[in-house]
Each structure stands twice: as C-alpha cells, then as structure tokens.
Amino acid sequence: MLEFLNRFFGRESSSSKNVAKERLRLVLVHDRANVSPELLTSLKNDLIKVISNYMEIDDKALEVSLDGDDNQVALVANIPVKRLKRANSPVL
C-alpha cells in the first residue's frame, strides 16, 4: 500500500515539475525572441482577419504561441477550421 502511495504521489510531483519546466521554457523563448504579449495578441488578430477571407474559423479557440530552442524560434498556430469558403468568394 505504501509503495502505491509513493508511486502515486511521485508521479504527481513529477508531472507538476514537468509543467513548471515547460512554462519556464516558454517564458525563456518569448524573452529571447523579444516578443511582447501585445505583439502576440496583435499578430493573432491579424491572422484571424486574413484567414477569415478563406475559411470560417473558430476565432475563440485559436491559439498562437512561440516555441523553440537555443537556435531558433517558431510561431505555432492552432486554428480550428469550421468550413472552407467557396473559391468564387471575393478576396480583398
């Protein structure tokens, strides 16, 4: 029984440790890229405007983040698509 509790609580702290580690990594990526939260929000709004010309998207569920390591930073966007717009729709 004690072994079960140790494994159970050991996994919990390990999981919390990994979450904290990932959050710190994301903070460092944003810091190294010198990107403010305001710029990321502005970029997200611009992406919504452009992509909405071609697709109906769930803009409330859209996620934009920066990811990377010591050598490079990547922009990662998760954009839920509800449906594609017809090809003959006017594009501005």
Curated annotation (Swiss-Prot):
Q: Keyword Heme: yes or no?
A: no
Q: Which UniProt keywords apply?
A: Cell cycle, Cell division
Membrane spanning segments where? none
Give GO terms for biological process. Answer: cell division; regulation of division septum assembly
Q: Name one Pfam family in it.
A: MinE
What InterPro entries is this protein classified in?
MinE, MinE_sf
Summarizing the function annotation, the protein's role is: Prevents the cell division inhibition by proteins MinC and MinD at internal division sites while permitting inhibition at polar sites. This ensures cell division at the proper site by restricting the formation of a division septum at the midpoint of the long axis of the cell.
Q: Which family does it belong to?
A: Belongs to the MinE family.
Q: What is this protein called?
A: Cell division topological specificity factor
Provenance organism: Desulforamulus reducens (strain ATCC BAA-1160 / DSM 100696 / MI-1)
